[in-house]
Amino acid sequence: MKILENVNLSEILWYKIGGTARYVLQVENAQDLEKAIDFIKKEKLKRAFFLGYGSNLIFTDGSFDGAVIQFIAPEKSSVSLIRDNTVEAFAGESLDSVIKFAFDNSLVGLEWAGGLPGTVGAAIRGNVGAFGGEIQDVVKEVVIAEITNSKIVLKTLRRFELKFGYRTSLIKKRRNLVVVSVQFRLTPTDAKGIQSARQAYLNNTEYRKRRHPLEFPNCGSVFKNISDPEEVKKILETYPDLEEKIKRDWHGKVSMGYLIKRLELAGFRVGNAQISPKHCNFIVNLGGATQKDVLTIIRTIQGKFREAFDFTPEVEVEIVQ
């Protein structure tokens, strides 16, 4: 475990937003995690927050008087093949490293995630998805740490026990649970299948480069796409022309990026945070943006939705105060 003191979180988090944390504890394995919990207990810290890259977080601008436990990739990769079609990885490994390892071992099933930032642990916690795929589709089991009264107990949960939902899971709902490692059940294929999967991965990665504002720090999709049938109905009452697009292109949901643009909010700016004209469900950091700037934009979008559709869209990002 590596201990860092008085860390400017804007220098280590994906979004480049955040105040100063009293400690950052970097962990590379389950043993490091146990040491981190012991450290928190020894120092009598009252706050702790677990993260990977922080690619889906908006952290407070103020000081964080506690410990940020950051899962990082081990110096020696933990990604391994434990059975013919099962790949295991520590929570701090990048999701991309697992995809590439799978390809090298003639396994497919994760290519839809090409170009997604973030760690394995964060992917499980938020049940990440794209292009019709979700991480829950390929999870076999997860080793989690249950932390209670500064004690840590490791447990193995099977896929159905994780209670996956749209961009959520049991781990996200219960703040004392942390992903330690994951087993993915993937699909064996031949050389032609791998070639096809690699091409899908490249296509998805290129799509992100073209359509997402990767030239600026961002936290990915700020809002969940609209999936609730009643909310979809309200949108169709206002925009009946979207019915075919919802069925054909959006997998039954309604794209938040499209709706924000249609509400004429593209390019809306507060301080150094801006709704990206490139993809309106992204709020980019133009340089020196604050959490306050971003939250003001989020509330503006939610206000416009209440006026137009009589409901408030749900944020996908996690906001840490």
Which functions belong to the PLM regions below?
Residues 1-131, 138, 147-148:
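Anion-binding (especially nucleotide phosphate/pyrophosphate-binding) glycine-rich loop
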Residues 77-82, 144, 223, 317:
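A structural signal for short hydrophobic beta-strand segments in well-ordered beta-sheet cores
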Residues 4-5, 11, 57, 153-293, ...:
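Phosphate/pyrophosphate- and phosphate-bearing ligand-binding catalytic cores of soluble enzymes
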Residues 82-83, 146-150, 188, 227:
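Short acidic-glycine loop/turn motifs at beta-strand connectors
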Residues 305:
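Conserved ATP-binding N-box helix of the HATPase_c
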Residues 36-40, 197-202, 297-301:
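Short amphipathic alpha-helices in soluble, non-transmembrane regions
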Residues 123-130, 137-142, 156-170:
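Active-site glycine-rich loop that binds ribose-phosphate moieties when present
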